[in-house]
């Protein structure tokens, strides 16, 4: 791994994740508030028992030793091979408007077909959207559908999220 936080779930670890990901200040604060919410909420009683889950032994963020690529041919083979076995690149070429590949907690590949992009559709990784021209849109809508206050694990996600895709489809 190129970077890994210590095990556990503390404000210091969440701050380190935010720093490593070059979050804007509002996201750093969002993460810390989500952690506060996580620490205050009880574990849900739906689903299987997770009584033995000990967050002090879990590493919540690991960045692999790679970076995002613009072309599938540039993605390292050890990352690309599982996707090739699943037939994802072929499916992308055949019918998908766009595809992204995430390895561990980082997006390593994103691509959108030119004809879709020409219509104003944006498909990129969350980190680029968070700090680029769509930053205000991300800020306005991030975790609004399932907010950190929804349940304990939504709060956990809000504190330590990484990776993911941003899609914008203009009206019309």
Regions found by a protein language model. Name each.
Residues 1-172:
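Glycine-rich and polybasic anion-binding loops at the starts of cofactor/ligand-binding domains
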């Amino acid at each position: 791994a190129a970077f890994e936080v210590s095990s556990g779930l503390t404000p210091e670890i969440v701050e380190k994740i935010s720093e490593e990901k070059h979050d804007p200040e509002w996201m750093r604060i969002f993460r810390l508030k989500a952690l506060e919410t996580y620490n205050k909420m009880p574990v849900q009683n739906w689903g299987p028992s997770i009584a033995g889950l000990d967050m002090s032994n879990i590493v919540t963020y690991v960045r692999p030793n790679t970076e995002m690529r613009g072309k599938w041919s540039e993605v390292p083979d050890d990352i690309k091979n599982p996707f090739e076995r699943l037939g994802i690149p072929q499916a992308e070429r055949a019918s998908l408007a766009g595809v992204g590949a995430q390895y561990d907690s980082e997006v390593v590949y994103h691509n959108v077909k030119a004809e879709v992009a020409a219509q104003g559709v944006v498909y990129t990784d969350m980190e680029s959207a968070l700090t680029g021209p769509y930053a205000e849109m991300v800020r306005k809508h991030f975790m609004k559908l399932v907010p950190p206050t929804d349940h304990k694990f939504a709060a956990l996600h809000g504190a330590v999220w990484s990776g993911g895709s941003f899609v914008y489809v203009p009206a019309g």
